[in-house]
Structures are given as C-alpha cells and as structure tokens.
Amino acid sequence: LIDQLNAATAPDTYAYVDVDAATGQVNALGMDAIRVGLLYKPANITPVGRTAVLNTPAFVTGGDGEARNRPALAQAFEEHATGERFVVSVNHLKSKGSACSAPDTGDGQGNCAVVRTNAANLLAQWLASDPTGTGDPDVLIIGDLNSYALEDPIVALGRAGYVNFIEAFRFMGGGYSYIFDGQWVILTMPWATPR
C-alpha cells in the first residue's frame, strides 16, 4: 500500500509504522487477514517513544473465550511544525454480525456488545498506562469500534474521559459517519482526550 501511495504521489511521501520490527514480535498485530495499521506523512510527523500493541487475551477475546477484537496499536508522534506530541491508537473491535457466546440481548447493540464494551474498558486502561512511554496525555483513538454513539462501548470511552470528535465538533455537517440501508448514523468515530 505504501509503495502504491508513494508511486501515486512522490517518493517517501508516506510511511508506515512497522509494528513487528518496532516491537520485536512476529505477527504482533495477529495473523488474521484484517489487521490494524498506521500510515503517516514523515514530512509532517515523526514516530517517538515505543510502538505498543495491546494483544492480551483479555483484550482480544473481550471475555468471550475466542479471539474477537483485533489487537490495538498505539504510537506517539511529534509534529515537526510545533514540536507537539500526541498518541494515536488504532483499533478494530468485534463486528455486530456474527455471534459470540453472550447472546444478542435485543437492546439494539447487536451481537457481542459485551465483548466490545470489555475491549473499550481495557483499551482506556491501557492508554492511561502510557504504553508508548512518552508521558504524553494527548491521545487520539481511531479505527472501527463497531458501536453506535449511545452503545455501551462508546459510553465506556466517554466515562474514561475521552471526547467524541463528531459530537464535540459536529463534523460532516450533521453528525454522521456511516450510511447503511438508508440510515445515517455515527458508527466509526474518532475519540480524543480533552485539551
């Protein structure tokens, strides 16, 4: 992907966080065909601190006994123009489609809501522990949380002190991030520590 992006733009316009090389772990982000990753523009920002992966059984299974969530990635960056630092955490929580051991409760959150909620709580705890070792409190959570705005995983992130960018700033002209079957909803949303 990086080669294609750089071919379409200019050499070295984009780079990626090589998680296995940075952590010394083979398949640190798992072996599934779907994995998280992090691309960036090295002309604007530089990775700093440790590349961190949350791939504990408790997080990946969400308490379900089988791998359900993708391992999470955290990387701190320093912006060249200002010297400011921030941490980006990329995530992909369990989808609503296939079943887990905990049945769909019929509350509208779909299958595996408890798995996503457990993962959101563990993610917030992990990020609070400074996994990148930079001591920087500015954290941006991105990726596919597979949860709508008022579902339990999202509420858990709010309780942990994170702010929903779409709600806070009314991005995208009306507060939605996903359209499916004619419904406009907030599904994949960035979260950040308040400043």
Spans of model-derived segments:
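Divalent cation-coordinating acidic motifs and surrounding scaffolds
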Residues: 1-195
